[in-house]
Amino acid sequence: MDADYGIPRELSDLQKLRSHYHPELPPCLQGTTVRVELRDATTAADPSGEHTIKRFFPHTYGQPLAHFLRATAKVPDAQIITEHPAIRVGVLFCGRQSPGGHNVIWGLHDALKVHNPKNILLGFLGGSEGLFAQKTLEITDDVLATYKNQGGYDMLGRTKDQIRTTEQVNAAMAACKALKLDGLVIIGGVTSNTDAAHLAEKFAETKCLTKVVGVPVTLNGDLKNQFVEANVGFDTICKVNSQLISNVCTDALSAEKYYYFIRLMGRKASHVALECTLQSHPNMVILGEEVAASKLTIFDITQQICDAVQARAEHDKNHGVILLPEGLIESIPEVYALLQEIHGLLRQGVSADKISSQLSPWASALFEFLPHFIRKQLLLHPESDDSAQLSQIETEKLIAHLVETEMNKRLKEGTYKGKKFNAICHFFGYQARGSLPSKFDCDYAYVLGHVCYHILAAGLNGYMATITNLKNPANKWHCGASPISAMMTVKRYGRGPGKASIGVPALHPATVDLRGKSYELLSQNATKFLLDDVYRNPGPLQFDGPGADAKAVSLCVEDQDYIGRIKKLQEYLDKVRTIVKPGCSQDVLKAALSAMASVTDILSVISSPSSVSTPF
């Protein structure tokens, strides 16, 4: 099986054309001389969890933010990396494949070779399993030739498993030592980058010389925080899904007799569903975050959709398209509680056929109410991160079944006057995640690969490659590196009334912000989407010409660029230091003190634990 990794692909004409496309580097990374600026130490976004994070990451917490600048940039204290000794770097894919992953490796390889042709890049075959077993493939120009700007992870393969246990961590360390690696680059999402942080801490503690770097690559779009604006693969996934959805919308409008229920891959968060809604304008989307915030039951959701169907029928519209995120099932309070009971029994070794009889009375009643196919799917063993196997639970069929039952009831009672309700169900996920990457994902991933090299060249450990100002062209991107521990939060698990909760620092999936601009845009258009059939077809992925440079709606409407703002703040502070120094006038000093007192008072209130939202 290992012999299949890294072999040349058979490429179509379009794939060949794409393999010749070379992404543009931002000015700060062009050439062989890059300046790195390390300034103030980072801190946790949630002050209440800082003590716990420090305790878990004593060696890698509180490291400074890194900015990569042009060699000509005149910035105090920024260092030019002049020496580039030959280094050995390992790279692996962790988690589900996401379009653009290959370009991270391509960018890393190019950066390694341009700075020292003797540098070596080793790819681990089969993800973390290949890391533990020390199965490697040397990445060369020949190996990369047919994987540039291509989808999938088939150059190296991947794994879903975490690097969690002591045995696994020790195996990873043994591999890095045996292969004499100066750096280890882990490409993945929330879980994989949490693992990268723990590995980096362990390596620092044991004086292992390997530096660990994480890269934000996940189709779910849920590795988002103040440092990370977007994830490699999300742009492609949403564009491919949006075309499929809009095709279905056109079909629904043509036949005028079907309701399509479409479940979208994306794990617990609803980012993919929200973005696809903003791109294709289906009639309705049920976001998991809305359901959780309003504590909607499965019956509430059913009634909500049925009321929408009835409202459309009153406008002589007996068709529609409804999007559902795959994480919706875990957002429904009573179903989530049922899953927790089932998973607890599975962990105790109770066989699936015996679980129903051991559930609590209310859970048993809900379980028996559900259709047989859903009961069977809920009994699947949880993933390695203890979440349900969401891609295997056909939520769209469950919701369609419940809606159809209710609509037939209303039809019989005479409260619904429309045509007989007909549902067609789809699950979109696998169709998109192996797609050719969009131009944005090709560019973003390639540049992140270069950033990984500069992180290692600067001797940094426990960092994630980050780029901000992404909604603008690549020549305006801000490249840097952020300590992964600074992105962590502490999730608290209550252990009953009066019991102390336990804190586990980790990267937690970012959910859709119901106060954010993307959700606001959806809310403003929800009624129009529901009743007016303003379906929008963005068409297939474009690699050149109109549409090629289009970016995710959610990326463009949010006002981000954290690194750029940090830089701007530092410039202001530097100006203050230049103006206010011993010898300045009393008026200048008094004005500075007054302004600073006001600013610090405001910031103290905003940053207090009570005003910081904490994930629970």
From Swiss-Prot:
Family that this chain belongs to: Belongs to the phosphofructokinase type A (PFKA) family. PPi-dependent PFK group II subfamily. Clade 'Long' sub-subfamily.
GO biological processes: photosynthesis; response to glucose
Role: Regulatory subunit of pyrophosphate--fructose 6-phosphate 1-phosphotransferase.
Regulation: Allosterically activated by fructose 2,6-bisphosphate.
Protein name, entry field: Pyrophosphate--fructose 6-phosphate 1-phosphotransferase subunit alpha
Keyword terms of this UniProt record: Allosteric enzyme, Cytoplasm, Glycolysis, Kinase, Magnesium, Metal-binding, Transferase
Subcellular location field: Cytoplasm
Main location: cytoplasm
InterPro entries named among the record's database cross-references: PfpB_PPi_PFK, Phosphofructokinase_dom, PKF_sf
Cited HAMAP family: Phosphofructokinase_II_Long
